[in-house]
């Protein structure tokens, strides 16, 4: 079979990997690491919980399906007429898993030997859906229990209450697993419909990192991959205003200390963000709130946060983007106020150059050291590819960042009128 090969080399790190466009439509990313004892493989599709409204290129109108189908489909794909895929992996000694996020569904394994056999299993079961009325109904009970369990999970609730207070219509505000009501509407026909739309190999990517023979990997792919049709699929979102829904939301649950999530809604989030944009925001967050920052020390000195729970993240994807700070605090309002004040000080006085340089070096070092892990490499390749980005471009962007890049992100995103505080309080 004819394949298009491309060697991609990082300007900063000097490492290389191969990108192969397979005739079946699948993009294959191969990152050899000869000294590695484990190989990690991950097969991902650009299909997550936010994809409940979509438009196929071969159909005239968009379609809407019940929430929770992507997650449901991931659960069901492990089952086939021949049994469970986990049982098949256990025979090769591979450790397998799968996950559904807001934007992607991924199936993965790691192994120390029997790689090609394990790869066959992965490519086989993901391309062989098997849904019946009986198995679909059985799964509804299992996932229904999972949904109810998350309803009382404080970390889950503080996050989704935050997203609901921030987003008016974007499906990021809905639980990944759906609701008990939405999954009751799922049928075998709907599962096949979504499978055939999103598990088209042209919408998917396979990445391997570790010690392997590239030719043998491609032989397995040639044998196992079923050619995709030329259908493309686009996400369809309702218009999302730049304004938030409400600035404060709280809920009582069984916690000892109040938990909080505080952050800012990025405007015009439907516009694409480059590798450089993402790197700039990550460096800004590190400069503002890392354990080396004045803000962190002040919050610790005032006993407003604890080191083990405080964290921050740039959470962004198709049609959404937000900067989030979370943790436990006796006074979440005081934490939010301190973050706002420090962002305002940065805007007024400028971001300290030394702190910016230190943060950039720290993050760059973390990213480069992650290239020693086959899991980090393969996950990074897939995650970047499914977002329309490239791993080495991101690393090179991090190294090339300027203070101006970071200041632009500060001015654009850290605005009080677009901030939300979500709190989970102890039950009275």
Annotate each predicted stretch with a short phrase:
Residues 323-352:
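Extended amphipathic alpha-helical segments enriched in small hydrophobics
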Residues 232-238, 307, 311, 349-359:
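Flexible, glycine/charged-enriched surface loops at secondary-structure junctions
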Residues 81-194, 306, 338-341, 351-379:
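Acidic/histidine-enriched segments that form metal/cofactor-coordinating
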Residues 98-101, 174-175, 196-202, 253-256, ...:
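Short, flexible turn/loop "capping" segments at secondary-structure junctions
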Residues 261-268, 287-329:
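A structural supersecondary motif
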Residues 2-9, 205-208, 346, 359-428:
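C-terminal regions of mature proteins
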Residues 1-84, 192-298, 420-428:
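His/Glu-rich zincin catalytic helix
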Residues 59, 74-76, 106-110, 130, ...:
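Second-shell loop/turn segments in exported
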């Amino acid at each position: 079979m004819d394949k298009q090969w491309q060697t991609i080399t990082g300007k900063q790190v000097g490492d290389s990997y191969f990108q192969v466009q397979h005739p079946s439509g699948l993009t294959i990313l191969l990152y050899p690491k000869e000294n590695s004892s484990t190989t990690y493989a991950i097969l991902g599709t650009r299909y997550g919980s936010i994809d409940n409204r979509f438009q196929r290129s071969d159909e005239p109108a968009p379609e809407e399906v019940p929430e929770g189908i992507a997650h449901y489909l991931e659960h069901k794909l492990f089952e086939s007429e021949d049994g469970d895929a986990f049982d098949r992996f256990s025979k090769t000694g591979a450790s397998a898993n799968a996950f559904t996020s807001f934007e992607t569904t991924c199936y993965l394994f790691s192994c120390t030997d029997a790689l090609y056999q394990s790869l066959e299993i992965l490519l086989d079961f993901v391309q062989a859906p098997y849904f019946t009325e009986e198995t679909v109904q059985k799964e509804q009970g299992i996932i229904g229990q999972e949904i109810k369990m998350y309803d009382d999970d404080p970390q889950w609730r503080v996050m989704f209450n935050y997203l609901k207070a921030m987003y008016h219509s974007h499906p990021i505000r809905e639980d990944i697993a759906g609701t008990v009501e939405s999954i009751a509407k799922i049928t075998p026909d709907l599962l096949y419909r979504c499978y055939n739309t999103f598990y088209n190999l042209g919408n998917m990517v396979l990445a391997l990192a570790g010690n392997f023979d590239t030719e043998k990997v491609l032989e397995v792919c040639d044998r196992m991959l079923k050619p995709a049709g030329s259908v493309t699929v686009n996400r369809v979102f309702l218009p999302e205003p730049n304004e938030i829904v409400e600035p404060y939301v709280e809920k009582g649950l069984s916690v000892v200390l109040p938990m909080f999530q505080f952050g800012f809604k990025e405007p015009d989030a439907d516009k694409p963000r480059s590798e450089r944009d993402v790197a700039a925001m990550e460096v800004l967050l590190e400069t503002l709130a890392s354990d080396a920052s004045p803000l962190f020390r002040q919050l610790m000195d005032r006993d407003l946060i604890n080191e083990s729970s405080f964290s921050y993240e740039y959470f962004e994807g198709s049609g959404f983007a937000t900067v989030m700070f979370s943790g436990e605090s006796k006074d979440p309002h005081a934490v939010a106020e301190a973050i706002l004040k420090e962002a305002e000080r940065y805007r007024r006085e400028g971001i300290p150059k030394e702190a910016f340089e230190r943060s950039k070096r720290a993050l760059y070092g973390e990213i480069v050291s992650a290239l020693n892990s086959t899991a980090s490499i393969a996950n990074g390749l897939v995650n970047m590819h499914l977002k329309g980005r490239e791993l080495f471009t991101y690393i090179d962007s991090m190294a090339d960042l300027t203070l101006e890049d970071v200041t632009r992100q500060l001015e654009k995103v850290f605005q009080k009128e677009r901030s939300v505080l979500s709190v989970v309080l102890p039950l009275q």
